[in-house]
Amino acid sequence: MAALCGFESLVAQSYAGEGAKIEPTMLIDKPTAGMLKRAHYAISSNYFQRGGVLVGVSVGLFDQFSFGISYGGTEIIGPNKIQMNPQPGINAKLRLFDETLMMPAFALGFDSQGKEPFLEADSLNRYTIKSPGVYVAASKNYAFMGNLSVHGGLNLSLEKDDGDNDMNAYLGVEKTLGPDISLLAEYDFAFNDNHLRAIGEGRGYLNLGLRWSWGKGLIIGFDLKNVSKNQKNVSVGNRTLHIDYIGAF
């Protein structure tokens, strides 16, 4: 992360590959300690099961603080009636400590946006993948055949109607592969998704991903989520598409 903190003021930038100019703010479903710098913005879109689309915008208000909003729904792509999420998601992140040679960067944040379809049946009132809620994240970068970033965090989601309100934890790694590509792996322990009424099977969520910078601020991502089959009716994994554009004012 420290190697990514110093960057030139470019109109459009990327967080993927060894040529990355900014810090990645997310793994796959979970946040890192990475920040959008002041006067930078990120426009993201995620495409998932049941014709789902989620669009978000985040802005770096200061080097140490960012804010964003997101909204989406299911059946947006396809012939069925569109089902929008009950409310927009909001996120805010504050960098507590910058990375040093010995210590990781730390950030405190809030993110109410869950992933995948919103579930109202049986009074669950939650996303398929719960939102992070309140979280603290740590990130450390190492020079290893390019860049190797290690991330982890603790989070407490506000989605508790399924009866599972436990504190959760997650880990992740990012490895650059050449100047434009990063490979991601994320493990969500899902301690808050293994109650009797929850939909998790107690194995946690193992997610794999790829991020590819196409230049001029455009990043394309492909994810294979829930490889651990932590929910019913999953044969291989949940395939999703992710598109980001990052620029500066």
Give the positions of each predicted feature.
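Transmembrane beta-barrel domains of Gram-negative outer membranes and organellar outer membranes
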Residues: 12-150, 155-159, 174-182, 186-249
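C-terminal segment of classical bacterial N-terminal signal peptides
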Residues: 3-11
